[in-house]
């Protein structure tokens, strides 16, 4: 913050560089929250107990007291807390704005909710029915009704602005909706949303999602929300909030045991199985949807970074830009290094294995090691590659000790790995899944470095007829069988993937048991599935409008018009009942343009489901999207030429007068 210089530039003009007398921070500087932590430390330095506590975020400070009555809490705040706060403000030159100070009693005793007052800086602050803290609106009884109403209001405002956009494809609209609207609703949902109980809140929140989905698909307003969600492949609101809560809980369980959040987690685990009228809170209720044993087995991810002054454990980590260069450099490293070790990982029948191989000059295996990593639902190929590197370092250490001689010169060792992502994760360690393995690699490399061994990591392309890499690949494949022969704990990333799969399975069950969307279920029996995004994704709005009518059954045909009382009969111009199947396959009035449709779609004409991009067979989510899109395009051309899917209401006479 001292000895800082700056100049002012405008176009070609620039002032001389001058010393900044009062050097502050630029707005948005990442140093701001760090410096505020030091600045606020004396104010916030209070123990958090069952009697109360204090916390702060930048310039938002909040103090809470827990007592038998509102009167008792107010007395302690006025006599103990406010004098200390005012003394800190005088000492630091700060000023608390009394007009921005809020007081709220969190109690369900109606008589105490607006009781008493406090005086700060000579101004009286009375209790209010709500208080806003970091964007979350608290109410007396923590029922969060006001916060949900505010979230709905803000999200609806953004959704209305979204409706004003023009010339966007469905996939673009969907992306904007998920980037701009859902974060407004989801903000701090883990605080106010109970995944098992908030039916009233969800009923109101569902209305926020319905409007944008109608806009995305250009659908009729009578289409059910569940059908719109399946067609746009957008998670229902309650499942999206549940997934968010589960991911947050899983992430919290990876924090070190010394972290303060663990006291709340352990309390929530004890309260998880409460029976009766005991107080509930969202964390404990959300834990009911998860497996505690699986959570306790997860890896630990330390949010604090590594010390920046630590020496680099590797002499070099080289990731070449192209395969040819990497092959040449790998051959050079093999000829120049005293010790060369290859590591690789492989998957087979749902299990992962890793292996390490060292070859002699005759390309014979002199040292090898195999590791059973575990099942793929708890481990990933990326982490298996990291485990291979970890055991490769131990192999280097072992070979170096076997070759100990009187020559005490520094040795060079190279580990060749065919995973770029594993090398990059080792080069740039962070607080991500697999952190413990990366830290173990760095620690092992530091120990090897202490033995005067210059250790290098280098990328070698896989399947390039490299004897060492091929040998490691074979051994890794042989090690990929049930079991686990290492000490690392299961990954957060795989647990998140498992939770996501469970959410999708629940969505599928709800869709299959729903009373809505019968027409769509007959057409497409594999929903919900991601390929519907590709069906609609690149269509212009007028084409998406046609496809939605065909697939949902809510359209301009007579059958639909009669069901809503817009027509007295459901007859086609040919006299038969006018349905989607009748128009596409049977109506004699459209025989001419139907011949062109049959030529373009071929065998798909045998099934209305195939014509409309649906399927009742095959592997879910992996259809032949190219041929399916071609078929749908031909059907949309036919539907447009038939002129059956546009409003056939009589046009009114134009108003040529000057009046209303």
Segments from the language model and where they lie:
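Conserved pre-catalytic core of RNA-dependent polymerases
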Residues: 1-29, 65
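RNase H-like, metal-dependent ribonuclease domains
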Residues: 2-3, 106-122, 142, 164-178, ...
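Short, conserved micro-motifs composed of acidic
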Residues: 13-15, 80-83, 87, 91-129
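Conserved pre-motif C helix in the palm subdomain of viral-like polymerases
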Residues: 21-50, 143, 171-174, 178
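Catalytic palm subdomain of template-directed nucleic-acid polymerases
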Residues: 24-25, 61-90, 108, 196, ...
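Active-site palm subdomain of RNA-directed nucleic acid polymerases
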Residues: 33-68, 400-407
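Hydrophobic packing residues in well-ordered alpha-helices of helical domains and bundles
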Residues: 54, 74-78, 82, 96, ...
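Inter-domain linker/hinge segments that demarcate the starts of reverse transcriptase
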Residues: 73-93, 156, 328-331, 387-394, ...
């Amino acid at each position: 913050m001292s000895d800082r210089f700056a100049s002012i530039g405008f176009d070609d003009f620039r002032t001389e560089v001058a010393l900044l007398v009062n050097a502050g921070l630029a707005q948005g500087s990442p140093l701001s929250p760090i410096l505020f932590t030091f600045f606020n430390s004396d104010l916030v330095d209070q123990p958090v107990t069952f009697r109360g506590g204090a916390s702060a975020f930048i310039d938002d400070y909040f103090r809470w007291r827990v007592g038998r009555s509102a009167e008792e809490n107010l007395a302690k705040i006025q006599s103990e807390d406010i004098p200390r706060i005012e003394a800190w403000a005088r000492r630091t030159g700060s000023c608390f704005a009394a007009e921005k100070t809020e007081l709220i009693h969190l109690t369900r005793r109606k008589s105490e909710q607006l009781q008493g007052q406090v005086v700060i800086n000579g101004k009286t602050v009375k209790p209010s029915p709500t208080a806003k803290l970091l964007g979350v609106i608290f109410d007396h009884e923590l029922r969060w009704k006001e916060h949900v109403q505010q979230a709905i209001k803000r999200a609806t405002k953004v959704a209305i602005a979204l409706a004003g956009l023009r010339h966007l494809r469905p996939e673009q609209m969907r992306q904007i909706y998920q980037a701009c609207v859902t974060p407004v609703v989801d903000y701090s949902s883990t605080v106010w949303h109970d995944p098992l109980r908030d039916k009233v809140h969800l009923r109101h929140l569902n209305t926020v999602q319905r409007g944008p989905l109608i806009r995305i698909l250009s659908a009729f307003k009578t289409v059910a929300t569940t059908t719109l969600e399946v067609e746009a492949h957008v998670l229902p609101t309650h499942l999206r909030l549940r997934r968010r809560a589960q991911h947050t809980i899983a992430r919290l369980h990876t924090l070190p045991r010394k972290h303060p959040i663990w006291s709340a987690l352990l309390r929530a685990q004890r309260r998880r199985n409460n029976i009766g009228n005991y107080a509930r809170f969202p964390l404990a209720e959300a834990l009911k949807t998860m497996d505690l044993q699986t959570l306790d087995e997860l890896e630990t991810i330390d949010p604090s970074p590594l010390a920046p002054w630590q020496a680099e454990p590797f002499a070099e980590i080289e990731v070449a830009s192209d395969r040819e260069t990497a092959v040449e450099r790998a051959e050079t490293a093999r000829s120049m290094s005293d010790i060369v070790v290859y590591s690789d990982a492989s998957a087979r029948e749902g299990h992962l294995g890793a292996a390490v191989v060292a070859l002699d000059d005759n390309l014979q295996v002199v040292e090898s090691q195999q590791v059973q990593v575990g099942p793929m639902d708890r481990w990933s190929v990326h982490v298996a590659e990291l485990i291979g590197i970890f055991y490769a370092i131990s192999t280097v250490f072992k070979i170096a000790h076997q070759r100990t001689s009187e020559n005490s010169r520094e040795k060079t060792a190279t580990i060749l790995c065919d995973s770029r992502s594993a090398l990059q994760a080792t080069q740039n360690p962070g607080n991500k899944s697999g952190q413990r393995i990366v830290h173990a690699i760095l620690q092992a490399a530091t120990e090897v470095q202490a033995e005067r061994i210059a250790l290098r990591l280098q990328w070698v392309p896989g399947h390039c007829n490299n004897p060492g890499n091929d040998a490691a690949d074979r051994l890794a494949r042989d090690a990929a069988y049930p079991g686990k022969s290492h000490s690392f704990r299961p990954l957060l990333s795989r647990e998140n993937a498992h939770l996501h799969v469970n959410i999708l399975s629940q969505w599928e069950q709800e869709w299959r048991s729903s009373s809505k969307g019968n027409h769509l279920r007959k057409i497409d029996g594999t929903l919900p599935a991601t390929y519907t995004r590709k069906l609609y994704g690149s269509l212009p709005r007028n084409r998406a409008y046609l496809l939605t009518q065909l697939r949902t059954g809510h359209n301009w045909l007579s059958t639909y018009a009669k069901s809503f009382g817009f027509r007295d009969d459901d007859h086609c111009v040919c006299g038969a009942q006018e349905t989607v199947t009748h128009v596409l396959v049977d109506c004699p009035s459209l025989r001419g343009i139907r011949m062109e449709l049959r030529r373009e779609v071929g065998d798909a004409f045998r099934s209305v489901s195939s014509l409309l991009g649906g399927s009742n067979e095959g592997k879910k989510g992996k259809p032949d999207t190219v041929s399916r899109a071609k078929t749908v395009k031909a059907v949309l051309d036919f539907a447009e030429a038939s002129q059956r899917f546009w409003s056939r209401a009589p046009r009114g006479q134009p108003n040529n007068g000057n009046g209303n």
